[in-house]
Design a protein with these regions (language model features):
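Surface-exposed loop/interface segments of Gram-negative outer-membrane beta-barrel transport/assembly proteins
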Residues: 122-181, 221-226, 232, 236-325, ...
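An active-site-proximal structural segment forming one wall of the substrate-binding cleft
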Residues: 340
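Short, small/polar-rich motifs associated with maturation and membrane association
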Residues: 1-234, 239-254, 327-328, 334
């Protein structure tokens, strides 16, 4: 990759110092960008634990498909998921917004570039730090739909029969008998814990510096049976063999696990569990007297169908994903003379994604018939990927008066 000094870049660029945002507890590093950089839109697409943010550097309007920026971690362009990176591993982030991006990275940077510099040790210093965060998340009452209670819903049904000139079923002749009833929407939610622990160790000597970060993040979802966990580590080491020869290694393994039932989707769909729960009459109880959950519930006075118990369905459905990833980098840099820098590097991105989805017969669709004993569905997939990038560069820079002459030669090979 060719290099340019910050003052030589004529385009728009912003640098975000993560040390100043160390007290902001987030699951994904992109969340720290919210409200920090002018002209960069950072939006949350879903409330599922562990899900990343949508980042738009040049806005959403484009004639081309896709609008995600290019992420470059320690000089290595990342093509896949970038949400596995622990925010506590990052030292700084620089956003290239316009022509500066394409001049360095070509067409891959059509929607901007996010340059990520991970933490490294400073010479002459040894530091050990530990930080922890614990919190509780809830869906605020202001953000919840206003649901009818049992009496209100039964009164509504009674009046609907009367308006149609039909006889009112016995079940709805005395609406007050149902009292408050049961809030199915609230039954699908919970108070969710969030925990974040990180240990950092860095040491710096004259010819050797190293930095190690170990992190554990655990976030329960406010929706039942949803959670996200991530275990990450990063080791950055630099060896100065001589005054003009430097060797560097970066190693970053990550393991993440998430479980999320199909909570999104339209009304009446098998995926919209939460939406379907809002349609369930509040006069029905989602729990038996002995504490167990019935498979289906039936509305009294209505001869039509049985409805699945959504509170049970969301706990019975299994939809989990396990991801393993290793980012590795090794580089050798040589400066034979002042202004001339020769560098060769090998970068690797290796990982796997395992998905397991099981929908038992106890989970069904809105207004569907009672589930069949053989109506279960199972889906499994295991995808592996790898990407190698070998890059050799030669950069020569010389200041002549008020001008700077820069010449760059780049050769790279990518295999994936």
């Amino acid at each position: 990759m060719a290099t340019q000094t910050k003052r030589a870049v004529t385009g728009a660029m912003e640098t975000l110092d993560f040390d100043k945002l160390s007290d902001v507890p987030v699951a994904q590093f992109t969340q720290k960008m919210q409200g920090q950089i002018a002209g960069v839109q950072v939006n949350q697409g879903t409330g599922v634990p562990g899900q990343g943010m949508n980042v738009r550097i040049r806005g959403a309007a484009s004639l081309s498909t896709g609008s995600n920026p290019l992420y470059v971690v320690d000089g290595f362009p990342i093509v896949g998921d970038i949400n596995d990176i622990n925010p506590n591993e990052i030292e700084s982030m620089t956003i290239l917004k316009d022509a500066a991006a394409t001049s360095l990275y070509g067409s891959r940077a059509a929607f901007g570039v996010v340059l990520i510099q991970t933490k490294g040790a400073k010479a002459g210093k040894t530091n050990i730090s530990f930080n922890a965060y614990m919190g509780v998340q809830n869906v605020p009452q202001k953000g919840r739909p206003e649901m009818m209670n049992g009496t209100e819903w039964a009164q509504f049904k009674k009046e609907s029969y009367e308006d149609l000139g039909q006889s009112v079923p016995t079940a709805f002749q005395n609406p007050s008998q149902y009292g408050k009833g049961h809030d199915w929407y609230a039954a699908m939610l919970r108070s969710a814990m969030i925990q974040d622990y990180n240990v950092s160790v860095s040491t710096g000597k004259d010819k050797f510096t190293s930095s190690f970060v170990l992190g554990y993040f655990n976030q329960d979802g406010v929706l039942l049976n949803s959670d996200y966990q991530r275990i990450s580590a990063r080791a950055n080491s630099t060896y100065r063999i001589s005054d003009n020869l430097k060797l560097a290694f970066n190693l970053a393994p990550t393991y993440s696990f998430e479980n999320r039932p199909s909570s999104d989707g339209a009304f009446f769909s098998g995926g919209g569990l939460l939406a379907n729960a809002t349609l369930t009459p509040p006069i029905l109880d989602y729990r038996n007297e002995d504490g167990t959950y019935p498979v289906v519930v039936t509305t009294p006075g209505v001869t039509a169908f049985e409805t699945p118990n959504w509170v049970r369905s969301i706990q019975d459905i299994v939809n989990k994903r396990e991801a393993k990833r290793l980012l590795a980098n090794a580089s050798l840099q040589y400066e034979p003379l002042k202004g001339l820098v020769l560098k060769t590097s090998l970068n690797g991105d290796i990982g796997s994604n395992y998905q397991h989805n099981f929908q038992p017969s106890t989970a069904g669709r809105a207004f569907a018939a009672a589930p069949s004993a053989i109506a279960a569905n199972l889906y499994e997939a295991n995808n592996r990927y790898w990407s190698w990038l070998s890059e050799t560069t030669a950069n020569y820079s010389k200041e002549i008066g008020n001008h700077t002459l820069t010449v760059a030669w780049i050769y790279y090979t990518k295999i994936s």
